[in-house]
Amino acid sequence: MGLKDYYTWTFPNIPEHVAQELDQLGRSLVVVGVIGRSRCVLANKMRAFGMEPPVDHEPTDGQLQCYYKPGSSTLLLHFETTFDDAILGQQIDETMEQDGAPFDFDGFYERMKCRFVRMMLLALHVCHILVYVETGQTFDLSLVTIFQLMKFAREQHLMQFLPSLLKETPAGRLLGEKCRLCTPRILFLFENFTHEEGKTRECVSACEFQTEDSIYELLRHHQIITNSSSSSLLALPNNKQFVFYNAHDQLHADRLLQSIEFLNLDMRKLDVKEEEDDLEVLELAPFDGFVKSFGESFESTNYEEQQYKTEHTAWHFLQRHVQDALLGCFDEGSFKQVPQRGQLQLLNAQEWHDCIAELHKLLVSSAGTQESLNEIRNEDYQVFLQSFDESLNYEKKFWAHLCEIGLKMGIEAYKKAAPAIYGSSMHQQLLAEATLAFEEEGRGPPAEASIAKMTATCLRHWQDGRQQCEQLSLRSQPCTQPKEMPHDKHNSGVIHVSSCNCGRTQGRREDPFSLRQANYEFYEHMVKMCNLCVKVKQFKFPIFEPTNNEYRAAAFEVAFPLLHAGKNRLAQDAELDPDEEDEELPTGEREEQHITQSNGCSQPLSPTFGSDLNMSIAGFGVSLNESEPCFDQSSSSEAESTCSGTSSEESNNELVLQLKEPAKKHEESCDPDSIAPLPSMCLTSTTEYLPGLVHTLSKVGLLPLFPSWSLACVGPSSIYSHNTGLQEHFQSGFLSGANFLLPWDVQLRLVHASKHYHNSHQPHMSKKQQRYRKHGDRMVLKIFVGFEYECSRGHRFMMCRPDRVLRGGADIERDTCSKMVHTNMPLYYPCPCRSQNNYLAQLMRIHVVTPKAPVNIIVDPKVCMGKDKYTFTLGSMVPPRLSQSAYWILRLPYVYQGDDALIAPPEKLEPDDIMAGGYLLAGMFGIAETDPTLDLNDQGHLDTNELGTFTRI
């Protein structure tokens, strides 16, 4: 014991001399359990009793430290639990050290709570008095929950197996049927007093009485204490104090702060109230403060307060309840209904040691181990070991119950709002609404797992015959057909309004899902509905014609689809001109040779239904072999001079057209040896077709399965009147004021052939040609051109500038059309129709009214778009000629597709970059002299040299 007045040891290692002293007490040993919270490193809750553990003490969860003061009948049993900060820190460190296991706070909290309940149950059965130590200044309401769990565990688990298991041991005879020494009396010790209140006797007593009333009401309300000892978990004294506030002793003080405080008090001197009569005495003092005391005067102290501080200690507070146990009035002082036979059992030290050893083994040391499961065959005890923690986890059950209710509400909300068939976006929206319905009730740690379960259930409900196909259309609209059920074709439910090829009839078109449906099938269907499309003669574009059933789409390099085509085109150009670098030709011969080569590459086309329209094809020269489109005006002018073989330097306002020599009869040059063979680039494949549209870098020889363009003559030029514009019965759907074509005056100067040639071949000219020749070498061609845009609602309008919609005749100036045809036109433009949605109109048709002159207008549109800068063309090796004095309409593709993927239209156009979605390149028109010697109804058998040349306007 040394300098201390008490003994301390760790259970069950009791020293022999202490055991001898305890044996001398006989059956007058009162066991007091001290349990609760602590903040010190040694987990010591005995500081209020003036006791401390050894210096080398290591706190451990579940460890019991015993204290005994000689001369008393009290054995203090100190419980080290997870409510001690030192023990809790150890458990946190062990949990954090587990590899790969994230820290689960809720699970950790439940484990700590269950371990504390085990220690409380042990104290409940082996102690006469329980002292709960609280470091705070108020009662912890969570302790009521702990008491409820203890009562539940004792009634539902412990009393099912303890009587039978203890019956075979000496502890069973000593403890009786209740398996405990008594209904223990619980006391509450608060280590700290509120600083706001004064520490006088009245203030401390008032605070203690107020806390006692609150605790008593709580424990009575939750039936922790009752009027009968047999049904009560704990006991409270009726007429004795059971709450103690430590108001005077500073427990667990900081040594450094204490030293600073002592130094401050030593340096400070308090003034004593001085009487006027003592001034003469004070004058005799050698210095100021000579007779002043270092503290309060003795007269100022209160003897009663000093006596209260001396007697108001935790030890005296405890001994009053110990005396009740020794005198045999323990139950009488706690309950109104006292049993006939007293339940309080006072044991000697050895008997008590045997009882606690057996109970500690059953409740604490062997709990949860496999050895105890194999050793003890009691079914109730095995259930206790396996499900004790789970049964006490009431919070988990509460959260699980709430999440179960929320899960039902969420699934019900999802199924109630779910339509028969819906897609992923609708599924996500319904799932978000179901989550909101779940969160009305479901919460807590299992909420995340419950939401995942609800998500899986809703997903199965969606996939059980309700899933939408969701195949995206070419306009990015999902298919609304069921995914599991077979359907012939996709349908998004979105309907567009579009016009036919000739523009006379408008029809409702479904959202296209394939290139063929968008650019070919709809317009073929509209031919049957339009009485004008049936009558017009259409230009037949070259398409793929297989020789057998084994044909496939051509494969392209996905990463660089244009690079391979560019390399092939350069290699073919090198094969066509092998001696270009070795030999320099004069300028005239080089131009003549270049024109001959370009004209010799024409591809034969089928006749146009035996049409009597003056429609032919002619070569563009180098424009057919261009690897890159001409974007600037200088490149366009250079190409024009090359194609025509003439110079326009004489006049900036005139277009020079050189009249060609009439071709000789076909019979005069039928020598097979004189016919030059067609270059290899003109050969078309019969096994592979082009999956997309033809563009400038397409692989040579590949043709599409169907034409995506349409060129039709809808009637003579007289059907258009510039005074009235396009009438509704002829072209329906145009917005008011936007139904006019733009007049285009082209000044043309004819350059005749040599005089000998002119005189010898004069009889071959037609009367119309002779009449124009008589009027002079200059003429003005009146052409009408219109760039038509159409939105998905069927609104059509013409443009007068790339950034302006035509608003009537006031917008038409003299040079408006001339500027239009020499400027890039945007492929998409916002529709001026009034709508909440911003509909984009697409360039769909180009209207051309040809003049009454012995010339043919030639069209060669090029549409540039896509991130890879595809430049789409008509696909003909030679562009078509338009007959004189006729109304022609060129219908552009509805959807554009390159070699690898679809080129989707932009969702929105910025006003400062209207060309972002694509544009029609300037310079699509050309002009050539009409040759009456050509048989235009049988163009496939014409020699390529007979097609002649033309001049780009």
UniProtKB/Swiss-Prot annotation:
Biased composition regions of type Acidic residues, renumbered to the chain: 574-586
Pfam families in UniProt: Smg8_Smg9 (PF10220)
Statement: the UniProt record of this protein carries the keyword Metal-binding: no
Stated family: Belongs to the SMG8 family.
Organism: Drosophila persimilis
The keyword S-adenosyl-L-methionine is assigned to this record: no
Signal peptide bounds: none
Low complexity bias (residue ranges): 634-653
Record's keyword terms, sorted: Nonsense-mediated mRNA decay
Chain's role: Involved in nonsense-mediated decay (NMD) of mRNAs containing premature stop codons. Probable component of kinase complex containing nonC and recruited to stalled ribosomes.
InterPro entries: SMG8-like
GO biological process, one term: nuclear-transcribed mRNA catabolic process, nonsense-mediated decay
Biased composition (Polar residues): 595-604
Superkingdom of this protein's organism: Eukaryota
Protein name as it appears in the record: Nonsense-mediated mRNA decay factor SMG8
Region of interest: Disordered: 571-604, 629-653
